[in-house]
Amino acid sequence: MVGPWVYLVAAVLLIGLILFLTRSRGRAAAADGEPLHNEEERAGAGQVGRSLPQESEEQRTGSRPRRRRDLGSRLQAQRRAQRVAWEDGDENVGQTVIPAQEEEGIEKPAEVHPTGKIGAKKLRKLEEKQARKAQREAEEAEREERKRLESQREAEWKKEEERLRLKEEQKEEEERKAQEEQARREHEEYLKLKEAFVVEEEGVSETMTEEQSHSFLTEFINYIKKSKVVLLEDLAFQMGLRTQDAINRIQDLLTEGTLTGVIDDRGKFIYITPEELAAVANFIRQRGRVSITELAQASNSLISWGQDLPAQASA
């Protein structure tokens, strides 16, 4: 049979166990539900995490002696307090600390006070600095724009100068070619005339030299211009040519424009200068229809006959 003292000891142990469990649960609930009033208390929670449960326990128990705390509950409370302190510390660091030289060309913001506000003096300096930076950027942009416009105008000027130069060179080339072509034609005409003037004497043809041919052609033309009205037979005799050869030479000169005049059906050549020919044409246009007699009479005053008489021309 079990004695009464055994029941007494069991009851005391049971009561002590109940009290221990009750106090442990109260401490855990107090550690979990304690509010954090501000950021400074949360930042310091990691430092006082160890002393806070001890002070709460001393206030609850008063003068009662300390007892052994439950190791598991204490570790959990400390871990929670440290976790809260670390999270709050990261938030504070994120608000107040700026990474140095995150990106080249970005200025550091002004220092933030613990209250999160910027001082008026610091703010004014920051605004002035930003204004100077904006002004520098605007001036730099303006300089770049001026450089771009100047480069564009210079390129346009060079392009225009090149176009004018090419145009001038093309014009000079065309003039040079035209002069060369004119000289070539004149030389060919001269060669034709030179080959045409052949002195035939006693059935023997003798080709003149270049100097003789040129002198002969000049003499031939001057004789006609001086005579104004010349018989083709007399001209051929004077030049030492056959009559048909003289007629052919005159026709060649008329075609080339060296001489101007007419050959009538009586074997005469009448030389008329371009000015006299224009005067006759003007007379015909003014009178309208003109007879041969009227034209012959007008020719006496419009055409200078030289040494020959007008009667010779009309004859």
Curated annotation (Swiss-Prot):
Positions of the UniProt region annotated as Mediates interaction with TRIP4: 119-217
InterPro entries per UniProt: DDRGK_dom-contain, DDRGK_domain-containing, WH-like_DNA-bd_sf, WH_DNA-bd_sf
Reported tissue expression: Ubiquitously expressed. Higher expression in pancreatic islets, pancreatic acini and testis (at protein level). Highly expressed in the intestinal exocrine cells.
Motif (UFM1-interacting motif (UFIM)): 196-210
Region (Disordered): 30-184
Ranges for region Mediates interaction with UFL1: 217-315
Domain notes: The UFM1-interacting motif (UFIM) specifically recognizes and binds ufmylated RPL26/uL24, resulting in stable association between the 60S ribosome and the UREL complex.
Name of protein: DDRGK domain-containing protein 1
Organism: Mus musculus (Mouse)
Organism placement in taxonomy: Eukaryota, Metazoa, Chordata, Craniata, Vertebrata
Gene: Ddrgk1
